[in-house]
């Protein structure tokens, strides 16, 4: 009997457990997914129609402007112009730097050649003409045509030097002589521009000889200029105009007539003539008085 009661109680417990689990599942199913009858009653469906916009065709439409250029053409054009400007600035900077470098090298070669020429003589051109540097050899070939008297007596020749022409005036000649002949010891400009400490003792002697020769040539040119100017003065090219000559003659006649009238008036005036004819009473000197006394006694 005991076993039967236990079996009945266990089966009752199992049934109650199954019933409780079925209730839980049912409630969960109802909460998670509503039934079709409840969904149809609670929700209502609404439909909306969205229109599709289609733009008109560009082909053959005069009221719509279209460009056949690709997108970004304006930015490409502006960028190319700006880049071209920057390229021009860079090229100008490079060209100016190259030109200044060439001028600096040319000045350096000129200074070296002049110093060497002043120490050695005229044979340096033939020795240096076969140099491997084309720029220096070309410069030296140009320098061969310059007179030797220019750089023999100069330790530091200036690049802006020019030979004085014989047709210069006295002032220009003096200034050119002041630039041409200078002493490496006394001249302040040469002392400031010196590039070596070498002082040639023969500079002064050569300068004096050259100065005397140039002064002699200048004297000859000045004398020739004076003789030519005298010939031009004797034969003037332009004569005075006839109207000026007539005015000058009339002026001379009027001045001469006035002078004659004044002289006549002075000679005819009785008061002035009487005053002039009457001698002035002056005191006699002692010597004249003694001479007259001795004459009366004799």
UniProtKB/Swiss-Prot annotation:
Q: What is its main location?
A: membrane
Q: Which GO terms describe its cellular component?
A: cellular bud neck; fungal-type vacuole; vacuolar membrane
Which residue intervals are annotated with compositional bias (Basic and acidic residues) in the record? 274-284
**Subcellular locations according to the entry:** Vacuole membrane
* InterPro entries cross-referenced by the UniProt entry: PRM
Q: Where are the transmembrane segments?
A: 75-95
What does the similarity note say? Belongs to the PRM5 family.
Its recorded name reads Vacuolar membrane protein KLTH0G09570g
Species this chain originates from: Lachancea thermotolerans (strain ATCC 56472 / CBS 6340 / NRRL Y-8284)
Instruction: List the lineage, top down.
Output: Eukaryota, Fungi, Dikarya, Ascomycota, Saccharomycotina
